From Swiss-Prot:
Free-text note on domains in this protein's UniProt record: The kinase domain is likely to have lost catalytic activity but retains ATP-binding activity. ATP structurally stabilizes the kinase domain and promotes stability of binding to PARVA as well as focal adhesion stability. The PH-like region is not required for assembly of the IPP complex or for localization of ILK to focal adhesions.
Positions of short motif Nuclear localization signal: 363-371
Modification Phosphoserine occurs at: S186, S246
Cited InterPro entries: Ankyrin_rpt (IPR002110), Ankyrin_rpt-contain_sf (IPR036770), Kinase-like_dom_sf (IPR011009), PK_ILK (IPR035692), Prot_kinase_dom (IPR000719), Ser-Thr/Tyr_kinase_cat_dom (IPR001245), Ser/Thr_Kinases-Pseudokinases (IPR051681)
Family: Belongs to the protein kinase superfamily. TKL Ser/Thr protein kinase family.
Tagged with keyword Kinase: no
Localization: Cell junction, Focal adhesion; Cell membrane; Cell projection, Lamellipodium; Cytoplasm, Myofibril, Sarcomere
Main location: other
Protein name, as recorded: Scaffold protein ILK
Length: 451
């Protein structure tokens, strides 16, 4: 089978769908030129493939090596329907590439008149200059130039030249495709790992920042008592299910090994510059989480959990809380698979009871509806996002477990958005059977995001 980039170029929708259904495939990877699958589908005008990639979570504003976004390529080649689709999903209409050109520069240069009109109607600036001092209108033939000038004036644009600045891109979420080879290495040679700095140490092990094959990574070295052949076998059998590359809101385990001389099981995952959601909310990062960003994080988490809940069987021993949600460089929240517990790791112990559903504290795991319990955890995360507080911060884990089991609940303070407040209460229904499923709350959060 040809690679995914060829399938996207050729518009082979069936092959692309089969490739996307494999959880070990990363739809945001790049080829040797930094083109993502979405870049190629937009360049070649493959509308069905573009739709499929966007629906599965392809990054809209991803850049290739020349800083072109998919919108640059669709505009250059006159694929009007794809341009409109990208704009519908909030593509950056004035994104600049390495030459300082925005998509409108290319639509004008290549005579894509309808695309140019659509771009201006949606806010593309007609007088923004590239590195060479040229505006998009300078690239257009006379009739189109006059039409765009007239349209821009009607929309209230200032037609004075806007000089090029290196900072045009700041404040936008620009990312590059990920290394497409990382998902090919399930088994990793411990000797290839370069440990740079210890980030944390707790009951479950050590967390390190490291480098592997030229990539920044996080290395998690697990603490396990009485390591045995059976535990080694369980580790090797359970790891592959954590290599989920196919969803943008799930952070996969890249690979695993057992480190010498003492066999410490070791997991490797992507480096996340902002750390966890807990770090962002409670540990004084420079990241500002306003109402809009809080809803975005909630939507990201709901989408990730909706996907995980489609897996059969469910990933066992996964606990949803703000320490197990990581924040990517483009401010995307991702459910971390490296935080899933293995069968040999302290069965029965609860390390974050503040986020655990009361029935999960009172019953055995096999007697608990995991999907409903996860929805309770999500409700606590909503509370955390809007209050910026740690739930039950003044209590010990044992006290928290007792309190939640005995109907102690986080208090919803006044001033919270009524929409968020209502959603929180629905998700935290005392009757697990009455809590919604994640695929039911995703559309609600999408509407809240659009307001």
């Amino acid at each position: 089978m040809d690679d995914i980039f060829t399938q996207c170029r050729e518009g082979n929708a069936v092959a692309v769908r089969l490739w996307l259904d494999n959880t070990e495939n990363d739809l945001n990877q790049g080829d040797d030129h930094g083109f993502s699958p979405l870049h190629w589908a937009c360049r070649e005008g493959r509308s069905a493939v573009v739709e499929m990639l966007i629906m599965r979570g392809a990054r809209i504003n991803v850049m290739n090596r020349g800083d072109d976004t998919p919108l640059h390529l669709a505009a250059s080649h006159g694929h009007r329907d794809i341009v409109q689709k990208l704009l519908q999903y909030k593509a950056d209409i004035n994104a600049v590439n390495e030459h300082g050109n925005v998509p409108l520069h290319y639509a004008c240069f290549w005579g894509q008149d309808q695309v140019a009109e659509d771009l201006v109607a949606n806010g593309a600036l007609v007088s923004i200059c590239n590195k060479y001092g040229e505006m998009p209108m300078d690239k257009a033939k006379a009739p189109l130039r006059e039409l765009l000038r007239e349209r821009a004036e009607k929309m209230g644009q200032n037609l004075n030249r806007i000089p090029y600045k290196d900072t045009f891109w700041k404040g936008t979420t620009r990312t590059r495709p990920r290394n497409g080879t990382l998902n090919k290495h399930s088994g990793i040679d411990f000797k290839q790992l370069n440990f740079l700095a210890k980030l944390n140490e707790n009951h479950s092990g050590e967390l390190w920042k490291g480098r592997w094959q030229g990539n920044d990574i996080v290395v998690k070295v697990l603490k396990v008592r009485d390591w045995s052949t059976r535990k080694s076998r369980d580790f090797n059998e359970e790891c592959p299910r954590l290599r989920i590359f196919s969803h943008p809101n799930v952070l996969p385990v890249l690979g695993a090994c057992q480190s010498p001389p003492a066999p410490h099981p070791t997991l490797i995952t992507h480096w996340m510059p902002y750390g966890s959601l807990y770090n962002v909310l409670h540990e004084g990062t420079n990241f500002v989480v306003d109402q809009s960003q809080a809803v975005k994080f909630a939507l990201d988490m709901a989408r990730g959990m909706a996907f995980l809940h489609t897996l059969e069987p469910l990933i066992p021993r996964h606990a949803l809380n703000s320490r197990s949600v990581m924040i990517d460089e483009d401010m995307t929240a991702r459910i971390s698979m490296a935080d899933v517990k293995f069968s040999f790791q302290c069965p029965g112990r609860m390390y974050a009871p503040a986020w655990v559903a009361p029935e999960a504290l009172q019953k055995k795991p096999e007697d608990t509806n995991r999907r409903s319990a996860d929805m309770w955890s999500f409700a606590v995360l909503l509370w955390e996002l809007v209050t910026r507080e740690v739930p039950f911060a003044d209590l010990s884990n044992m006290e928290i477990g007792m309190k939640v089991a005995l109907e102690g609940r986080p208090t919803i303070p006044p001033g919270i958005s009524p929409h968020v407040c209502k959603l929180m209460k629905i998700c935290m229904n005392e009757d697990p059977a009455k809590r919604p499923k994640f695929d039911m709350i995703v559309p609600i959060l999408e509407k809240m995001q659009d307001k």
